[in-house]
């Protein structure tokens, strides 16, 4: 049986969850349509998803059509959940990008399409909600050409309200874009020679799968228009990106989820081989795990299985698998372009509304952060506050609602602040000697630190000979320094500097690598105190796409948000502003743009780097380490 994995992507409220329901219903996987409004859909599982009518976590379901099984990945559609989207994209064989016939191409549509093209995923455009009044498809087509890609091929003829009808094109006009993109076909056409349908279809298929051509289909998911045709297109047009024939096992973990009974589930895409129940499988070429329970989606329901084949998405109950773990042979994993997940740029303090629920809150955060790499937390060793770092405010709203709905814990949040970094101000050296109080470790370490240009990162070198200090001790020093760099003088990560291990001494046989590992961050803190550090704040590069009539407002408002516009371009009655902005200002600037352009602007950002801040330094509480905090305190008293 052919197995394909497709993604359903769209901006908020374009109808992707409703489309998923229609695909399941028309294929016979379910006997009754679920409703977003009634909260009965198969893929929006949390209360917050049902209340808002938006997808927050990746939902997975499936249907079978003739000899093809289709796994559907119903991905999130909000800016703050792009990490979920990117993880899901890595397992797809193809994508359906929904565009609302009423709303056209929205900001989120452009961001998602950018990701799909960057990762090389064949994509179909599905224009949804064509049953609404006042639809002008020619305007939607033009919108797609200007904002997404001009390389589209319209596959259907559409009669709009009130005589709703969608039929496949049979005329030659649908092939214009295909012919124009191939010199041989164009020359043949211009010379008056006839073109066979087969060669046109082959050319379309080639360009579709190399992501240089995008077929356009139409329908209404809510009223079941065009869905049967879309099912045929999905099963015939997409290929499975799996190894054919006998091969070793290879699979990749792309999602971690906890059930209401606190069972930990790992979602895995199999790329080759066969996975059997009770198999012992090597993970990321290291430890092995035993498969004790295995599930997959069959016609919209999760079912236990005893084997799974290449191309399948399986779910294992396992406590040790992590996101991006590879099961089996890592060499068989497809080489697909990656999109870096955005870094958490905000932090805040969280406490339970009821103090007696503190342990419940910590247990819940452990599970949530395990599932979401963009949420990190620690407990301050001095104030005992719980510190969270995260990506955006909507993400925090979702976590708050999840804590209340699933874990029955209400929380109180402080106003979030930006996550900074630190860089040494000058060169400095410091040595802590063995058996010299208050050093309790059987190790001597001497370090030097030098500032480097912005963007250089942390560089480490050792000038201590391996003949003098063996590799295990040297590795322990490097590990301790990397740990120490996580918290500088103000509590932020240390970067843009060179740290040199200049001196080391051990006593045989009492010294161990642990002595060097524990002492290294203490020496690093002392050398940073001699050098001093300056605070660096994150800056984002941005591209703003806005209608030409809003140029003046967008440009003039930039200084108010500390934004520096470095380039302005005009394209298709749209202005593209490029520049950079402090991360602490982007949320307000983006909200302002959305407000005064009535949602017609797009603001794409990525981390550019860090700049030196001015003004009073912002401090972050240190994370606790019971083994070295007391020694740190003693050294800080004497220096």
UniProtKB/Swiss-Prot annotation:
GO MF entries: GTP binding; GTPase activity
Keywords for this protein: Antibiotic resistance, GTP-binding, Nucleotide-binding, Plasmid, Protein biosynthesis
Family membership noted in the UniProt record: Belongs to the TRAFAC class translation factor GTPase superfamily. Classic translation factor GTPase family. TetM/TetO subfamily.
Known function: Abolishes the inhibitory effect of tetracyclin on protein synthesis by a non-covalent modification of the ribosomes.
Keyword NAD included in the entry's annotation: no
Gene name of this polypeptide: tetM
CDD domains, A to Z: Tet_C, Tet_II, Tet_III, Tet_like_IV, TetM_like
UniProt organism field: Neisseria meningitidis
Entry binding sites for GTP: 10-17, 74-78, 128-131
Record has GTP-binding as a keyword: yes
Family matches, as InterPro entries: EF-G-like_DII, EFG_II, EFG_III/V, EFG_V-like, G_TR_CS, P-loop_NTPase, Ribosomal_Su5_D2-typ_SF, Ribsml_uS5_D2-typ_fold_subgr
Example of a GO biological process term: response to antibiotic
Protein name (record): Tetracycline resistance protein TetM
Domain annotation tr-type G: ranges: 1-242
């Amino acid at each position: 049986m052919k197995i394909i994995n497709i993604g359903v992507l769209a901006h908020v409220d374009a109808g992707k969850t409703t489309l998923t329901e229609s695909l399941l219903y028309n294929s016979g996987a379910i006997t009754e349509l679920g409703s977003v409004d009634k909260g009965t859909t198969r893929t929006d599982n949390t209360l917050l998803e049902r209340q808002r009518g938006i997808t927050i976590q990746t939902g997975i379901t499936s249907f079978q059509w003739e000899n093809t099984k289709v796994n559907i990945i119903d991905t999130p559609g909000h800016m703050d959940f792009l990490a979920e989207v990117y993880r899901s994209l890595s397992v797809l064989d193809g994508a359906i990008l929904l565009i609302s016939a009423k709303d056209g191409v929205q900001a989120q549509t452009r961001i998602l399409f950018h990701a799909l093209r960057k990762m090389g995923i064949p994509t179909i455009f599905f224009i949804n909600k064509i049953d609404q009044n006042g639809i002008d498809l020619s305007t939607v087509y033009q919108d797609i050409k200007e904002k997404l890609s001009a390389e589209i091929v319209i596959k259907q003829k559409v009669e709009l309200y009130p005589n709703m009808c969608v039929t496949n094109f049979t005329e030659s006009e649908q092939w214009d874009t295909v012919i124009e993109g191939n010199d041989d076909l164009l020359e043949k056409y211009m010379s008056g020679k006839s073109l066979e349908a087969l060669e046109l279809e082959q050319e379309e298929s080639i360009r579709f799968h190399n992501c240089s051509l995008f077929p356009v289909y139409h329908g209404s998911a809510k009223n079941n228009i065009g869905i049967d045709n879309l099912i045929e297109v999905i099963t015939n047009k997409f290929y499975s990106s799996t190894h054919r024939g006998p091969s070793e096992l290879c699979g990749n973990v792309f999602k971690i989820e906890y059930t209401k009974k606190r069972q930990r589930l790992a979602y895995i895409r199999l790329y080759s081989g066969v996975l059997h129940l009770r198999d012992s499988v090597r993970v990321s070429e290291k430890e092995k795990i035993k498969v004790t329970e295995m599930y997959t989606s069959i016609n919209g329901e999760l079912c236990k299985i005893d084997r799974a084949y290449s191309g399948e998405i399986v779910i294992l109950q396992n406590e040790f698998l992590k996101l991006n773990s590879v099961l089996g042979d890592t060499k068989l994993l497809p080489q697909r372009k990656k999109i870096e997940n955005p870094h958490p740029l905000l932090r805040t303090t969280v406490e339970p509304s009821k103090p007696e629920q503190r342990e419940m809150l910590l247990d819940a955060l452990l599970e949530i952060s395990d599932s979401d790499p963009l949420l990190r937390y620690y407990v301050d060793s001095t104030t005992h506050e719980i510190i969270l770092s995260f990506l955006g405010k909507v993400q925090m709203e979702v976590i708050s609602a999840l804590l209340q709905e699933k874990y029955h814990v209400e929380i109180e949040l402080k106003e979030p602040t930006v996550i900074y970094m630190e860089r040494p101000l000058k060169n400095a050296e410091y040595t802590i000697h063995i058996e010299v109080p208050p050093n309790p470790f059987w190790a001597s370490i001497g370090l030097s630190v030098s500032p480097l240009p912005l963007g250089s990162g942390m560089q480490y070198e050792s000038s201590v000979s391996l003949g003098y200090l063996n590799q295990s001790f040297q590795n322990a020093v490097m590990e301790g320094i990397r740990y120490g760099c996580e918290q500088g003088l103000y509590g932020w990560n240390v970067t843009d500097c060179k740290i040199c291990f200049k001196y080391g001494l051990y006593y045989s046989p009492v010294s161990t690598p642990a002595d060097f590992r524990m002492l290294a961050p203490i020496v690093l803190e002392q050398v940073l105190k001699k050098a001093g550090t300056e605070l660096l704040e994150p800056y984002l590069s941005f591209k703003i796409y806005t209608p030409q009539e809003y140029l003046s407002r967008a440009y003039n408002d930039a200084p108010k948000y500390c934004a520096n516009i470095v380039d302005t371009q005009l394209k298709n009655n749209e202005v593209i502003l490029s520049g950079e902005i402090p991360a602490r200002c982007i949320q307000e600037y983006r909200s302002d743009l959305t407000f005064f352009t009535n949602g017609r602007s797009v603001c794409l950002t990525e981390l550019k780097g860090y700049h030196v801040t001015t003004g009073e330094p912002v401090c972050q509480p240190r994370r606790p380490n019971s083994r070295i905090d007391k020694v740190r305190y003693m050294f800080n008293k004497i220096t």
